[in-house]
Amino acid sequence: LCGWLQDTRNLGGIAFLQLRDITGVIQLTLLKKKLDADDYKKWTNINRESIVSVRGIVKENKEAPGGVEMLPDNLQILNEAETPLPLGVIDKIDSEIETRLNARYLDLRKSEIAANFKVRAAVSGAVHKHLRREKFLEVQTPKIIASATEGGTSLFEMKYFDKTAYLAQSPQLYKQMLMGGGLERVYEIGPAFRAEEHNTPRHLNEFISIDIEMSFADDDVVMGVMERLVDSAARAVAKETEALETLGIEPIELNLPLPRITYDEAIEMSNGKAEWGEDLSMEATREIAAQMNGFFFITKWPLSLKPFYIQPDDDPKYSRGFDFMYNEVEMTSGGQRVHDVNMLKERLKEQGLDPDGFNHYLDPFRYGMPPHAGWGLGLDRLSMIFAGAKNVRECVLFPRDRTRMTP
C-alpha cells in the first residue's frame, strides 16, 4: 500500500500508524518485539503527511478503522514531509477558509473537503450525461472577446497584442449565433469571468458556467430542461453515499415539476421587502423562500429588469425571462430570446446600447434566426447546494475572488 502517514501513536511496545489514500484510512499495527529495534524507532518517528510504501499481512480487526489492520514487515519512506505543517490535516481545530485556501494542497487531504469535490464531480458528470441524452451538442466558445457586448456587468479588460480585449462574462451571444447556424441544441460547460466587486459566500469572479441554448423553444421548454437536469444531478449525488456520510448530509430529492411563481406573486410574498419594478434583494428572497421549499422558478419578470436579448411577453410590460432559485439563493437566469432583428435593435437602443457595435452578433438574425431560448447555470453554486456547503469556495479548487489570485 502507498499513501500519506497521517498519524502515529506509540505506546511503547506497540504503535498504531494511520495510512491514508483517496479511498480511506487503514491502521498499521507495529509490534516492537517482532521488528528490528532500528526499524521500530524509525517507523514510529516519521513526520506526519510523509509519503510511505508499506507491505505486510492484512487481517480483520473490528476495533481498527474500516474493520481491518495491516501488520507491516516492510515500510519505505518515499518522501518525508517537512515539519511543522502549514495546515493540520487531521487536527480538530477549525482553520479560517483563507488559511485553508493558502494551503489548499493540504486542505484537500481532509476527507470532508475531498468529499465536496466528489459531489462536484458527480454533478458535472450528470450534467454532461443528461444533456447528451436530450440531444444537446457540446460546444466551446471564445473567452477572449473584442467588446463589452452584453452590457450591465463589468468585464475584465486585458491587452491583446496591440489591442484591448475582454474576458467573456458568458457565452450568451455566441450560443445565439449557433442557433442561427442551425445547430439547434447546444451546451457548454466552461469558465466565465465577471469583474464585480461582490465579496459574499456565493460570488466568485471566475466561475464555471453550464449554458444551454435551444431552437424552436420558449421559456417553458427550457425550464423543463433545467428541472430535469437538476433532478439528474441530484440522483447522481445521491449515489455518492460515502461522500454524503462524510459531509453528514442527506441527499436532496426533487419532485417534478418544480414550483413556478410569477414575479408579481413573488412581490406579494416578499411582505413589503420588495417593490414592483425592483430586483429582488436577499431580504426579499428570504421572505419568499420561507414560503417555498428548495428549488423553484420565478417567471414573468418586468422587461426593464432583463437583458436586451430577452423576449417581451404578450403584455410588453413583462418578459419571457425567469430566475431559478434554491431557497433564497439565485441559481440562474434564463428565458426566451428575441429572434427578430428589428425588435433586437430596438431593445438595444432601449438599454442605451448602439446596434452598430453589435453587427457580428446581429448578422445571423438577418438571415433566418429561429425562435430560441436558453439559460446559464453556475456549476460551482450548484455543487455548493448539493454538498451542503455554506461558501461556494468550499467547492472550487482554487477560487478567484476580488482579493485572491493565488495559489
Question: At which residue positions do the language-model features occur?
Answer:
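Extended, domain-scale alpha-helical bundle/helix-rich regions
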Residues: A217-L229
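Alpha-helix capping and helix-loop boundary segments enriched in small/acidic/polar residues
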Residues: A165, H198-N199, A217, L254-P257, ...
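TRNA-recognition modules of translation machinery and tRNA-sensing kinases, especially anticodon-binding
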Residues: G181-P191, T200, L204, I208-D218, ...
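A generic secondary-structure signal for well-formed alpha-helical elements
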Residues: R9, V54, E60-K62, N79, ...
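Metal-assisted phosphate- and nucleotidyl-transfer catalytic regions
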Residues: T149-E150, R228-M325, E350-D363, Y367-G368
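Class II aminoacyl-tRNA synthetase-like tRNA-binding/catalytic domains
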Residues: L1-S215
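Short coil/turn segments at secondary-structure boundaries
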Residues: P86-V89, R120, Q140-I144, E188-P191, ...
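Alpha-helix initiation and N-capping motif
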Residues: P84, D94, L101, Y105, ...
